[in-house]
């Protein structure tokens, strides 16, 4: 004989380290769940990146140049130096309704034509199939107010003809290139680039709504501080449309800037056009008065001194008129307390003082000379004013015609070649990380809130006897997996583990249980053993059937009664039929003495559950069941009764009154200590003592760091 013993001693570490190790081990055990969930997230991300609508980006560059100083105020000095452009204000102008509204009107953006596709995946599928360029160009679409809530659908018949219908009953047929008018609806389709049968939804948006959409998709930033260069970026689904939209925005911004710059000249020209006739009229009146006075006084000539005074007064009036123009310009930029404005006012005051002195000299002249000086001054001053206005008019006309504004489009809009979003690599990576995190958190939370029994010591520390610890059979697990893949229920086996692989560690543990039962049942009132469970699907029937098999191998007659009349499957496990089973016996349709069915294992008989009755618990409370147990106890060395889980139904509490020994099966890492204690409490309330617990399906866990260690034993015959 060859004996192999393996001991895996758990390290003795601090509590914090044990907790970390347990968490890591829990994740390692559930690695396939983690991998599976992460793979699902990654797959969803891949599908999303394939079917999500790509968003493109177009950009343009504009420069805001510094305004040149006005010719009328350049000579004021350094106080009138040029200012850097106010970029923040210009950014707001670009995003204003004035600029964007004109773009909406120019490009007919308030009319949207969208192809009808399958929800979510349709547009992406069309792109994959190369059909994303199917479009219908609509330039005019109006409908009466009562139809504003209706949805209009355009159906393509061919590359020239189409039909237009609405969910309100409207229907019409039209041709591309011709205006369709019917019942107040006006539609102009310029071109059709789509397959026959394609459907499009035609929508009319409000101008304000489209402006808001443009503002959401438009980004304007300044390149550098006070650099006067603005970067415009626009995002959207259509590569060509976003380029056209951004070009239109830049062009409209430039045009409004030019209009704003030339508006002042236009207003000044209009004012001069109104003032020139009046000034000319006053000049004519002054000339007529002077000529009449000269004729009346026989052409009076002025002495040299009077002429000098007259020339000085005319010159001062000309300077005062020039200052009036300058003051009009400066007042737009500065207040009267500004040094430049104060300089102008001081110069005006000096001229006024000089003019007052000259007026005093004129007053000292003879009356005839005073009058001729006054009339001559009025004529010459009027002529200078008139000529100044004519010169100003010509300047303004030149200014208006040559205005270029402060905005220059440096780079026209161009759509970038790549896709702005979705960023496929980043999305897939993010989905993998998210799936990994969520799966790990889920595994840890499940482990935290569902702490199954992880060692026999947990039960023993609470005063619960553990009669056997049965390891998980890899041989049985492999056979169950094959059966599952083939679509057969896991419990439908043709061979017990005790027969198919009698040297399995699980069977050795059941043999150890057989030895323990031999001594445990010595003081029992009868030879009837009830096997119950804490909850469903814990391997109770597996333990019960294999225990009966190994006991029968000791030359003892064993009867297994399947008392789970709801879901019992022992007859399938042992390869027998379900005819004339327990339910038929209890309702009097079967004979107790002939109910036992032999199995393929010698001295091992079975009473199957029979047909599923409507009242299993009531049948177990009948006298007929007591008679069956008494008969079986007398005719067999051991009677094993397989009952349903105590936490699920009350059948085990009923059967327990007729047995001498009760054992309860709990599954390792599945059932909790609370469930075991609750089950024992149920039996205690019904006066049924439970001898102990069988811990089933023990496996080596990565998270099970225990100070008692983990042992594996193999004890096989030497090969001959």
Swiss-Prot record:
Annotated positions of the Phosphotyrosine modification: 569, 708, 710-711, 713, 715
EC assignment: 2.7.10.-
Topological domains annotated Periplasmic: 53-424
Keywords of the record: ATP-binding, Cell inner membrane, Cell membrane, Exopolysaccharide synthesis, Kinase, Membrane, Nucleotide-binding, Phosphoprotein, Transferase, Transmembrane, Transmembrane helix, Tyrosine-protein kinase
Catalytic activity: L-tyrosyl-[protein] + ATP = O-phospho-L-tyrosyl-[protein] + ADP + H(+)
Family: Belongs to the etk/wzc family.
Protein name: Tyrosine-protein kinase wzc
């Amino acid at each position: 004989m060859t004996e192999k013993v393996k001991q895996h001693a758990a390290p003795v570490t601090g509590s914090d380290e044990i907790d970390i190790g347990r968490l890591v081990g829990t994740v390692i055990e559930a690695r396939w769940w983690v991998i599976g969930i992460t793979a699902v997230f990654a797959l969803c991300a891949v599908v999303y990146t394939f079917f999500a609508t790509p968003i493109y980006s177009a950009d343009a560059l504009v420069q805001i140049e510094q305004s040149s100083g006005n010719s009328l105020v350049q000579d004021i000095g350094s106080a009138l130096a040029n200012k850097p452009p106010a970029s923040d204000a210009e950014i707001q102008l670009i995003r204003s309704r004035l600029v964007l509204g004109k773009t909406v009107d120019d490009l007919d953006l308030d009319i949207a034509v969208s192809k009808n596709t399958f929800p979510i995946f349709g547009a992406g599928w069309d792109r994959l199939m190369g059909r994303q360029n199917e479009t219908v160009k609509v330039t005019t679409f109006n409908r009466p107010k009562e139809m504003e809530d209706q949805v209009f659908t355009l159906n393509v018949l061919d590359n020239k003809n189409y039909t237009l219908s609405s969910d309100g009953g409207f229907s019409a047929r039209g041709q591309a290139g011709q205006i369709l008018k019917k019942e107040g609806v006006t539609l102009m389709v310029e071109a059709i680039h789509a397959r026959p049968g394609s459907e499009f939804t035609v929508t009319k948006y409000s101008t304000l709504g489209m402006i808001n959409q443009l503002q959401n998709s438009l980004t304007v930033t300044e390149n550098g501080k006070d650099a006067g260069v603005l970067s415009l970026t626009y995002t959207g689904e259509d590569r060509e449309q976003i380029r056209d939209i951004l070009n239109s925005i830049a062009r409209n911004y430039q045009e409004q800037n030019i209009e704003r710059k030339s508006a002042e000249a236009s207003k000044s020209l209009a004012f001069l056009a109104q003032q020139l006739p009046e000034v000319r009229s006053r000049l004519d009146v002054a000339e007529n008065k002077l000529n009449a006075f000269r004729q009346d006084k026989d052409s009076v000539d002025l002495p040299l001194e009077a002429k000098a005074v007259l020339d000085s007064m005319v010159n001062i009036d000309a300077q005062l008129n020039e200052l009036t123009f300058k003051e009009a310009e400066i007042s737009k930029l500065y207040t009267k307390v500004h040094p430049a404005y104060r300089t102008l006012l001081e110069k005006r005051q000096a001229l006024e003082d000089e003019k007052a002195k000259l007026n005093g000299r004129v007053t000292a002249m003879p009356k005839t000379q005073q009058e001729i000086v006054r009339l001559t001054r009025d004529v010459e001053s009027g002529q200078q004013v008139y000529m100044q206005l004519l010169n100003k008019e010509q300047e303004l006309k030149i200014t208006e015609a040559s205005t270029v504004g402060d905005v220059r489009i440096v780079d026209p809009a161009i759509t970038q070649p790549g896709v702005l979003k979705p960023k496929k690599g980043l999305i897939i990576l993010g989905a993998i990380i998210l799936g990994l995190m969520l799966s790990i958190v889920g595994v840890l939370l499940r482990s935290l809130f569902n702490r199954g029994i992880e060692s026999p010591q947990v039960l023993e520390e609470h005063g619960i006897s553990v009669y056997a610890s049965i390891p998980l059979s890899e041989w049985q697990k492999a056979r169950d997996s094959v059966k599952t893949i083939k679509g057969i229920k896991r419990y439908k086996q043709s061979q017990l583990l005790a027969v198919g692989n009698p040297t399995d560690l699980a069977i050795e543990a059941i043999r150890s249980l057989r030895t323990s039962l031999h001594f445990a049942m010595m003081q029992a009132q009868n030879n009837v053993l009830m096997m119950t469970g804490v909850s469903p699907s814990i391997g109770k029937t597996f333990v019960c059937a294999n225990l009966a098999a190994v006991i029968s191998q000791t030359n003892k007659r064993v009867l297994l009664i399947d008392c789970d009349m709801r879901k019992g499957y022992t007859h399938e496990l042992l390869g027998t039929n379900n005819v004339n089973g327990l339910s038929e016996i209890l309702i009097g349709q079967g004979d107790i003495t002939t109910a036992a069915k032999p199995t393929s294992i010698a001295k091992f008989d079975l009473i199957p559950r029979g047909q599923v009755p409507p009242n299993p618990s009531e049948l177990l409370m009948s006298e007929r069941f007591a008679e069956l147990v008494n008969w079986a106890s007398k005719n067999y060395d051991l009677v094993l009764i397989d009952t349903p889980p105590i936490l699920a139904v009350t059948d085990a509490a009923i059967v327990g009154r007729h047995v001498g020994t009760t054992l309860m099966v709990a599954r390792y890492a599945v059932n909790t200590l609370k469930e075991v204690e609750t089950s024992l409490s149920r039996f205690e309330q019904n006066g049924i003592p439970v001898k102990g617990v069988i811990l089933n399906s023990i496996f080596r866990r990565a998270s099970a760091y225990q100070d008692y260690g983990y042992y594996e034993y193999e004890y096989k015959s030497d090969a001959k």
